[in-house]
């Protein structure tokens, strides 16, 4: 013990500080033991003895004033160290067990330090005017100036450990078998008393061991927990954190564990930035994708309206992309549209040929209109014109439908059917006008030839003239009569009675003659029209439909004469109107 003190007293400049620290050690030991015992008594008051009482038995009564002063100093120091009690209370039991083996030497060491305190004061040469109160004040300053972090820099841990080991060997030889369940704080204070011969850095090293031991253990445990929670590709969510909220509160402070929802002051707002964590869970249905796209469109539209209100013009593509949030909306919108298109394509592939059914039915129903209207034979131009535009599948379907439907011959030709063939009739009329080129008023011939002696070839152009003067409606009505009449002209032209007055010399007739011809022509027209109407009514009663071109062959003469009389009647009306105009002029 004497050699240890001599090692610390080689430098005379630290003599007063050494004496002050020696005076402080028993009292600080008593105070720390009292504090630790109070902490332990709060947890288990029955199983632990009063450590403060054991120290007071060994302490001499002459040091009571100094103990009171130093107790106040330690209490002030304990105020400056409010968090150390928390760390010491959390110290694991395994550390208490590991240090219990040294406790029997520590109790005897306390008694030895008290008995040798006077000897320290004499050898150090303490001045007479320094009282215990001054020593306590110096001790208080020393304690207040101790650093809390990196206290091991003053003295190496190896020297402190060797000094403590030598002291334990000397004291263990004196007393054996004494067991005192002192806490870890007693050992730290005892180390201060043992190393009191050294200057203040030795005192700092003792407190560093007491402070850093539980603090290092706590930091190691906390860092391992935080490493398990926050590190890695897949951070671990707190059990108190809702999985559905997709919260990332554990990333806000990497040095602290996630707090429960009840301790949080606010809820994290929903925004598009937080939606990025759920990109892996894209909506998988068409409805969800459509809603997502509509919401993005709504956001972009609101941005455009706000931009237009502020700058008085609509934003361009560059204005939209310059805003990071709008750029993200646009990218999400393009991605959502692409996913929606792929999803629809996938569903259509799964359904197979189901979407092709309705168009095929429509194509099959449309060509069946001529069949239902009773024109299976006369609808020859329709399949030829529509067959070029429809696919082979439609033709096959049309044939199948025609085979399934029963034949209907009593259907009527409607105006809608005539409008379908109207383009063909218009083309026929144009070609006919180009080829015929008729003249309304033929040249006047001076010879007075009879109608019988006049060649029939001269009458052919006049016969073809009325067709060009017919209106569109009449031409459509009687255009089907032209071809059969033309076909019958070479064979039956001799049997047809020529008119009494030819159309070539009608312009030479006077007004009374024209009026007589007008009355006769109207009478003939009524007669022929009546005959043709009776034929059509009888045919309709028999077949249930109006006669077509091939059905008019038995009445071809009447149809030809009726057509010629209509043309003559029109010419007479024109000539009479001309003479009336000339008379008025």
From Swiss-Prot:
Keywords: Phosphoprotein. Residues 26-45, 83-138, 171-216, 250-282, 349-391, 441-477 are annotated as: Disordered. It comes from the Eukaryota. Residues 27-45, 99-112 have a biased composition (Basic and acidic residues). The modification Phosphoserine is found at residues 131, 238, 385-386. The keyword Phosphoprotein applies. InterPro entries: FAM13. This is Protein FAM13C. Residues 262-275 have a biased composition (Polar residues). Belongs to the FAM13 family.
């Amino acid at each position: 013990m004497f050699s240890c003190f001599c090692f610390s007293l080689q430098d005379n400049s630290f003599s007063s500080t050494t004496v002050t620290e020696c005076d402080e050690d028993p009292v600080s030991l008593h105070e720390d033991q009292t504090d630790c015992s109070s902490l332990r008594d709060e947890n288990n008051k029955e199983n632990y003895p009063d450590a403060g009482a054991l120290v007071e038995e060994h302490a001499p009564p002459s040091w009571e004033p100094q103990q009171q002063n130093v107790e106040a100093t330690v209490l002030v120091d304990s105020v400056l160290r409010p968090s150390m009690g928390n760390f010491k209370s959390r110290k694991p039991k395994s550390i208490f067990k590991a240090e219990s083996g040294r406790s029997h030497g520590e109790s005897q060491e306390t008694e030895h330090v008290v008995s040798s305190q006077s000897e320290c004061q004499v050898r150090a040469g303490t001045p007479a005017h320094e009282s215990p109160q001054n020593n306590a004040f110096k001790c208080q300053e020393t304690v207040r100036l101790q650093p809390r972090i990196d206290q091991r820099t003053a003295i190496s841990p190896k020297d402190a450990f060797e000094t403590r080991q030598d002291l334990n060997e000397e004291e263990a030889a004196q007393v054996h078998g004494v067991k005192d369940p002192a806490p870890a704080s007693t050992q730290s204070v005892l180390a201060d008393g043992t190393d009191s011969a050294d200057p203040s850095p030795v005192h700092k090293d003792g407190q560093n061991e007491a402070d850093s031991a539980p603090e290092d253990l706590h930091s190691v445990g906390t860092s391992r927990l935080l490493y398990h929670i926050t590190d890695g590709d897949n951070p671990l969510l707190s059990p108190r954190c809702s999985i559905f909220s997709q919260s990332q509160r554990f990333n806000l402070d990497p040095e602290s564990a996630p707090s429960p929802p009840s301790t949080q002051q606010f809820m994290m707002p929903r925004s598009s930035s937080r939606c990025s964590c759920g990109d892996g869970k894209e909506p998988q249905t068409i409805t969800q994708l459509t809603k997502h796209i509509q919401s993005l469109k709504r956001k972009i539209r609101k941005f455009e309206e706000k931009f237009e209100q502020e700058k008085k013009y609509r934003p361009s593509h560059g204005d939209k992309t310059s805003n990071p949030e709008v750029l993200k909306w646009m990218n999400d919108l393009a991605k959502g549209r692409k996913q929606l298109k792929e999803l629809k394509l996938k569903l259509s592939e799964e359904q197979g040929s189901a979407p092709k059914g309705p168009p095929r039915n429509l194509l099959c129903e449309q060509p069946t209109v001529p069949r239902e209207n009773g024109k299976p034979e006369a609808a020859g131009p329709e399949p030829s014109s529509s067959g070029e535009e429809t696919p082979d599948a439609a033709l096959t379907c049309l044939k199948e439908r025609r085979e399934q439907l029963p034949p209907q011959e009593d259907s009527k030709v409607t105006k809608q059917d005539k409008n379908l063939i109207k383009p063909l009739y218009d083309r026929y009329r144009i070609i006919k006008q180009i080829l015929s080129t008729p003249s309304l008023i033929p040249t006047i011939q001076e010879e007075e030839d009879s109608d019988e002696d006049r060649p029939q070839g001269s009458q052919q152009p006049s016969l073809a003239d009325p067709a060009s003067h017919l209106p569109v409606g009449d031409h459509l009505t009687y255009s089907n009569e032209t071809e059969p009449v033309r076909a019958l002209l070479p064979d039956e032209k001799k049997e047809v009675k020529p008119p009494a007055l030819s159309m070539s010399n009608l312009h030479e007739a006077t007004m009374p003659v024209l009026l007589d011809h007008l009355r006769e022509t109207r009478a003939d027209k009524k007669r022929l029209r009546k005959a043709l109407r009776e034929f059509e009514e009888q045919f309709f009663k028999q077949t249930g439909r109006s006669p077509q071109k091939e059905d008019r062959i038995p009445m071809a003469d009447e149809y030809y004469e009726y057509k010629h009389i209509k043309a003559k009647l029109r010419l007479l009306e024109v000539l009479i109107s001309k003479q009336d105009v000339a008379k008025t002029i």
